[in-house]
Amino acid sequence: MQRSLKWFASATTLAMLFVLIGGALVTKTGSGMGCGRSWPLCNGQWVPDHITPELIIELSHRLVSGLAGIMVLILSIWAWRAIGHVQETKFLAVISFVFLVLQGLIGAAAVVWGQSDFVLALHFGISLISFAAVLLLTLLIFEIDKTFSAASLSLDGKMRFHIYGITIYSYIVVYTGALVRHTNASLACPSWPLCAKTRLLPVQFHEWVQMGHRLAAAVIIIWIAAAAIHAVRHYRRQPVIYYGWLIALLLVLAQMTTGALVVFTQLNLYIALAHAFFISCLFGVLSYLLLLALRTRRAPVKAADHSAGEAAPATLK
């Protein structure tokens, strides 16, 4: 694989991560209207004459997103030509660019015409899909699957259920988290993990949004912990699965910690951005596990020595 392609893929992945964090920064700082209802111009000007912090944040996010879009398009074409023989390459190349354009259109529509909070909450999730596709393309370019002998993987039904279920469910958790941001419900509940020390249930809309996200997050933490335990017990000799779930567990615990700290620190900006960073990384890990699971589903089932003394996947319960 050409070294230049690897470098460019890495840079594009990093650029997409900046798009995600930048979008979270725009929302957290209330900078979405920093350029007024003007797009792609800023307040109807190419070079704004009245500079505010909100304008700088919004304009920077637009510039980074535009640069990332160009980089993703170049990477998609380059990867298509260089590793198009790898089955997932063309699909990921298309998804990465299409979803990045889609999130840009939603962002532009929100500025020009305005959108409901429920529609705006999709903005981060759509960007996340594009980021995951770029990340997977990068991993294919680096041939990570060969490094971990991913071609010889064999997964039992329970592990496949965990991978498919958690990956899909994580997107729901992401949406609820984005909804918390867009409805300004981050500090609706002054306590943690309960909404308030004096009562158990929320009493108004913003509290329900906040507690709905906390409940969704609690479920995914428990579910990922269960998947990690299953991986530790049965997949010690398949490191990509074993370490993949351990990393996912660490990331979701970091996500939980930063989520709690957002409340305790009264919405500290750096902690809030770390919260967005950890969920982006977690979704990337889950997406790679999903790619591997889809590969093994297509491939003939092979007897796998998951761990010393364990039976093949077909006999696991």
Curated annotation (Swiss-Prot):
It is found in: Cell membrane. It is an enzyme of class 1 (oxidoreductase). GO terms for molecular function: metal ion binding; oxidoreductase activity, acting on NAD(P)H, heme protein as acceptor. GO terms for biological process: heme A biosynthetic process. The keyword Membrane applies. Residues 1-6, 84-90, 143-159, 233-243, 292-317 are cytoplasmic. Pathway: Porphyrin-containing compound metabolism; heme A biosynthesis; heme A from heme O: step 1/1. Heme b binds at H213, H275. Keywords: Cell membrane, Disulfide bond, Heme biosynthesis, Iron, Membrane, Metal-binding, Oxidoreductase, Transmembrane, Transmembrane helix. Its EC number is 1.17.99.9. It catalyses: Fe(II)-heme o + 2 A + H2O = Fe(II)-heme a + 2 AH2. Disulfide bonds join C35-C42, C189-C195. It is a multi-pass membrane protein. GO terms for cellular component: plasma membrane. The active site is at E58. Residues 28-62, 112-121, 181-211, 265-270 are extracellular. The chain crosses the membrane at residues 7-27, 63-83, 91-111, 122-142, 160-180, 212-232, 244-264, 271-291. Its cofactor is heme b. Pfam families: COX15-CtaA. It comes from the Bacteria. Interacts with CtaB. The N-half (TM1-TM4) and C-half (TM5-TM8) domains are connected by an intracellular loop. Each domain is formed from four-helix bundles and they align in a pseudo twofold symmetry manner. The N-half domain is the substrate-heme O binding domain and the C-half domain is the cofactor heme B binding domain. Belongs to the COX15/CtaA family. Type 1 subfamily. This is Heme A synthase.
